[in-house]
From Swiss-Prot:
It comes from Leuconostoc citreum (strain KM20). InterPro entries: ATP_synth_b/b'su_bac/chlpt (IPR002146), ATP_synth_F0_bsu_bac (IPR005864), ATP_synthase_B_chain (IPR050059). The keyword Ion transport applies. The gene is atpF. This is ATP synthase subunit b. GO terms for cellular component: plasma membrane; proton-transporting ATP synthase complex. The keyword Ion transport applies.
Length: 169
């Protein structure tokens, strides 16, 4: 056969050839048990770790996106609340301003009414004093007139004065 003729041509004894083949096969079995098994195990573990890391990175990316969306939502809510607080403060300030204006207007109205009342009282007092003065003056004039005889012109002047006094009242 092929193997025997080749061996004869190379002058390698058959026993040596069998020993080399068996040694090679034993070496392959030992390598498979000692090196290939652990090597494939390490490679499988490495592939699993890479897969786990990729899944973890994807999960972290998704969580980061969710947190970013949540932060954006919270920021929008905070801005809306700040806008509402500012609007409420403006409305409150406007209400206080309106209330102060109303109080000031009411106070001014009260002061105006009091001034009108005081003016009316002063006017009435002045009229009463004037009446008293006119009465006193009339009595004085009458007493002087009684002391002297009235002429026609004096009588006419007295009547005109009396009529004009009545018209002013």
């Amino acid at each position: 056969m092929f193997g025997l003729t080749t061996l004869a041509a190379n002058k390698l004894p058959l026993g040596n050839m069998l020993f080399i083949i068996i040694s090679f096969l034993v070496l392959m079995v030992i390598l498979k048990k000692v090196a290939y098994g652990p090597l494939t195990k390490v490679l499988d573990e490495r592939a699993e770790k890479i897969s786990t890391d990729i899944d973890g990175a994807e999960s972290a990316r998704q969580e980061a996106e969710n947190l970013a969306a949540q932060r954006q939502s919270e920021l929008a809510d905070t801005r809306q609340q700040a806008t509402k607080v500012v609007a409420d403060a403006k409305a409150s300030a406007q209400k206080q301003s309106d209330a102060l204006v109303a109080v000031a207007a009411e106070r001014a109205n009260t002061i105006n009414q009091q001034a009108q009342t005081d003016a009316e009282k002063l006017k009435e007092d002045a009229i009463a004093n004037a009446k008293n003065d006119v009465a006193a003056l009339s009595v004085a004039i009458a007493s002087k007139l009684m002391q002297k005889e009235l002429s026609l012109n004096d009588q006419q002047a007295l009547i005109d004065a009396y009529i004009s006094d009545l018209e002013t009242k």
